[in-house]
Amino acid sequence: MVTGAPTQFVSSSGTRYTYFRTHGYLQTMGAEVNSKTYSREQRTRYRQRLLENLDRFAGYLSTATFADTASIGLELELNLTNQDFSPALRNAAVLEEIADPAFQTEIGAFNIEMNHPALAIGGSGLRDLEDSLRLQLNRADTHAAEVKTEILMTGILPTLRPSLLDNKEWLSAGKRYAALNTSVLQARGEDVHIDLRGKESLSFYAKNIAPEAACTSVQLHLEVSPEDFAPAWNAAQIIAAPQVALAANSPIFMEHVLWHETRIELFKQAIDTRPPEMRNQGVRPRVWFGERWITSIFDLFEENVRYFPALLPELSRSSGGSTSAGAPLLPELRLHNGTVYRWNRPIYDPGEHTPNLRLENRILPAGPTVLDIVANAAFFYGMVQHLRTADRPLWTRLAFKSAADNFLACARDGLESTVYWPGIGEIPVAELIVRHLVPQAALGLQELGVDQQLIERYLDVIRERARTEQNGASWQISYLRRLEDEGLDRRAALAELTRKYWQNMNSNAPVHEWRLD
């Protein structure tokens, strides 16, 4: 882990932000674990602790005062490549050069993660976010170049090859990563089966969870009060489908063209603890969309404890402890929550002074550009605000299964997909976004106090991406086809595609403007 003084950033509006480790892996997964394997006694005691933590959480929710600043935050996972754009297994060296606590390891040695501090969305907040991200990434690029490494923002690196699975250096240093790999394989009892059927088909067995490291994302955070959490989560579940359709950027894995957002299905399979017999019995996967609308954040934590065995049963000495403000620490409950991979995850953070609840949106792939990332964030925050405050909630008119079906259809086919929408029926998702959702997102952003010129700046990007039906996935698929039509073999074409993608990414031109010639 990188240590050092927090990084400060002064925005174009003059606001000073300090980067600190609040929204990332340690907050959701707990502190560094102490073991790579666990005994039956540890697992038994951990289960007891989970139930105790859950009871404390239930009591605390009904009496506590939580932060209610409606702040937003962001995590961005990044790929590291060599100068030929093959994966570079040297995140430790890159992080040593960057020497900034805003940047941390991820499970794959060819990944790092950047954590952005919480900020207010109102006024110039979104532009401050854009400026800050660009500044931090430019700094990281400069430092990475010192060890001959490039940084790439995409959902799955197109140049990943099967040889990665046999490279013992793929896993980042740290007991928590080794423990997660061991626990998934032990729970499953056999090798990991990856079976993806899209434009092409890919099926193989992996001896570790290395395929999970291929999946890099943008994770958006929204701080909400206890009474607002359920409407916000339900709204986020509904818009998951148009979100993933708009942002799809992971069409290629292990030299195969698969789903537009292959990362969704790949992540599910890569850390699936269920052998086929358990899947056939209907046992829930750890990467989970959910199965019902909720009425409280407690519903989700209760499901976590009821349905999912512990992956990392790490017992904490602070289990019964509280902060100086009286917020229970609940370390086992929070660690367990970090090993249930919901696409919209609840976060309880006891904080240093005031506890807070957050919604962590995990649907978006990384990239393609900083402008696209902030436009995706604007769309998400605007839609959640609009839907959660509606007089007649949309989730009262949509079966949960329909929301889940929409999500999978959009992950598979991106902006080419069709969805079912209440009050409309079947509609192409691109048309839904342009005609209906962009105006609704604008209303939500207005309610949040976002400057009007910024609403237009970011939602124009969303509108044009949907209108042209060109996102990161469709551009990659089309550009690969063009290169192969010109005579390049698949491997050479993927290397050239990734070079051109990197060039476009650094231009910061939104992806709908990327050319195919």
Where are these regions (language model features)?
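Acidic, Ala/Val/Gly-enriched low-complexity intrinsically disordered segments
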Residues: 2-5, 10
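Phosphate/nucleotide-binding catalytic core
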Residues: 9-517
